[in-house]
């Protein structure tokens, strides 16, 4: 396809009709050429989801109470309210254990049928072995990551069912070695989310992506695929517990005005701020997330899990 030059850029129209397209730009005078891969996700734009990090306390509550339904747990009941009202799909990243003596092995499978019946709007995935230490997988190798991810996935399948699993997760602290990410990928997680903070931020939260170019690309465009490792990285849009309630809508409005950053909206919040016993409890936790979800719906975003819109096809 011949390109035209506008004094600054060479441009040419091309049609994307498949997931992966290799594009080659060639100088017909010198023979010099450059190639790149383009990925087309036709259903990616205009979608949103809720994602929850650091989850373990609600699971301990389920284990310690004789509830007739998982939705007698106030935490899960709130997310069901959002589903019932807006159709919101919620992705929950969980720990294997808490900071005391509880592990998810103590969960009964008595609610398994109910988990499965709600799998059209709920997901459970591996987050980490536990909340502490911070940055637990910063230097972890393949075997350490595999040990923890396999343990959590096995428990999810046991007490909730494989229907709740999927190829997407957010790793605790979002820092890992390439070997650790290979273990995640081999366990089934080939779509990874994080903050991907731009330099010179001291906490990249960017898995093994250490170059400024990769981090800036993800910060500005919200998606990048490592073709060598067969892993797709996606940036979350907002961490709601870090914002005042009145700041949420203006922040999301700003994102939506940028077509590169506002295509898919991941509304992230952490579990602990929901619970009154937590020292940094946020009484308006529900209001924050209802505000964020209502904004998404009123701005035309539809609920979707990432495996429905970002997986290879």
Predicted regions: what is each one?
Residues 4-10:
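Aromatic sugar-binding surface patches on proteins
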Residues 13-20:
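Surface-exposed, short loops/turns at beta-strand junctions within beta-sandwich domains
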Residues 25-27:
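Conserved structural position at the C-terminal beta-strand
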Residues 35-118, 165-167, 267:
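Active-site beta->alpha N-cap acidic-glycine motif
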Residues 77-88, 101-127, 185, 221-227, ...:
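Acidic (Asp/Glu)-rich catalytic clusters
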Residues 89-177, 200-204, 269-275:
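Metal-dependent polysaccharide deacetylase catalytic core of the NodB/CE4 family, i.e.
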Residues 101-104, 163-164, 173-266:
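Active-site-adjacent pocket scaffolds in enzyme catalytic domains
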Residues 192-196, 264-313:
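C-terminal domain-boundary segment and adjacent tail
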